Amino acid sequence: MAQHHLWILLLCLQTWPEAAGKDSEIFTVNGILGESVTFPVNIQEPRQVKIIAWTSKTSVAYVTPGDSETAPVVTVTHRNYYERIHALGPNYNLVISDLRMEDAGDYKADINTQADPYTTTKRYNLQIYRRLGKPKITQSLMASVNSTCNVTLTCSVEKEEKNVTYNWSPLGEEGNVLQIFQTPEDQELTYTCTAQNPVSNNSDSISARQLCADIAMGFRTHHTGLLSVLAMFFLLVLILSSVFLFRLFKRRQGRIFPEGSCLNTFTKNPYAASKKTIYTYIMASRNTQPAESRIYDEILQSKVLPSKEEPVNTVYSEVQFADKMGKASTQDSKPPGTSSYEIVI
């Protein structure tokens, strides 16, 4: 008899730690931001349930059995969970909808039943992630040596998230950075980056032919840009040199022909003198020698000139010979004396 009780005690000692371990085990539950998540309770005998109390940082809700044909009744005890919690029958699984980042954390469910062990505790850890968008592949380093494209590819998501892993196919490389040594024989390959977190995954691809084309185009663009800059520089130097030589020429011309000189006066207004010249016609004496047939006298006007030029007036004055003078000799048979001009400027 004593031996029988000893075997029962040993059996209880073996099963108690196992039951305690089950109660203290933490289940990880992953949820997606803005969507719903389910906490699995999985009660084997729903009719034995009296009440389930849910707590987190604060009290969350408690669940009581409904009628035989209705779902369990949920009473929310914290305002942050209003209209976002319901329970599924018949296993009393708890559902939280419209997940927020602040919902993440530890949760505990105390399950009270009518039979032994009367109270069972289950623990959960809720992790919330964003659904990943399409990753982006960028070329962070490019080089081309001996017809080989050496490219460093970087794969990234729009918002850096926790627990995001990257994988490259067909190479099977892990990590968001991939170093490629592309040869002409491998131009038909396509590299695919897959970003993944515990709740979602997405991918993007790029062809090897596109990589090498982008490298060649990049070098051509760089070379063309450099030539354009050099051409603009030489054009600017040519323009500045032309302006400098022109100004130097004008300065030297001003030194050779200073302002006020006859050349400058004539160059600026070659018709100014003719507009201000007055001619006087005077008959010369018959005894005037042929060598002295014309006499020019130039008289300069005052330096102060009127602002507006007056019209040119020509005055002719004729002098008649006296009646007592005889006829001229044969040598003087030419027209009576040549006219003499008096020029007034």
From Swiss-Prot:
Extracellular side: 22-225
Transmembrane segments: 226-246
Effect of mutating Y316F: Reduced tyrosine phosphorylation and reduced binding of SH2D1B. Loss of phosphorylation and loss of binding of SH2D1A and SH2D1B
Keyword annotations of the record: Adaptive immunity, Autophagy, Cell adhesion, Cell membrane, Disulfide bond, Glycoprotein, Immunity, Immunoglobulin domain, Innate immunity, Membrane, Phosphoprotein, Receptor, Repeat, Signal, Transmembrane, Transmembrane helix
GO BP, sorted A to Z: adaptive immune response; autophagy; defense response; homophilic cell adhesion via plasma membrane adhesion molecules; immune response; innate immune response; negative regulation of granulocyte macrophage colony-stimulating factor production; negative regulation of interleukin-18 production
Domain Ig-like C2-type: 135-207
Broad class of the protein's primary localization: membrane
GO cellular component, one term: intracellular membrane-bounded organelle
Motif (ITSM 2): 314-319
Residue span, Ig-like V-type domain: 26-129
Short motif ITSM 1, span: 277-282
Location relative to the cell: Cell membrane
Compositionally biased residues, Polar residues: 328-345
Region (Disordered): 326-345
UniProt PTM: Phosphorylated by tyrosine-protein kinase LCK on tyrosine residues following ligation induced by agonist monoclonal antibody. The association with SH2D1A is dependent of tyrosine phosphorylation of its cytoplasmic domain. Phosphorylated on Tyr-296 and Tyr-316 following platelet aggregation. Phosphorylated on tyrosine residues upon high affinity immunoglobulin epsilon receptor aggregation in mast cells.
Modified residues (Phosphotyrosine): Y279, Y296, Y316, Y341
Signal peptide stretch: 1-21
Protein's name according to its UniProt entry: SLAM family member 5
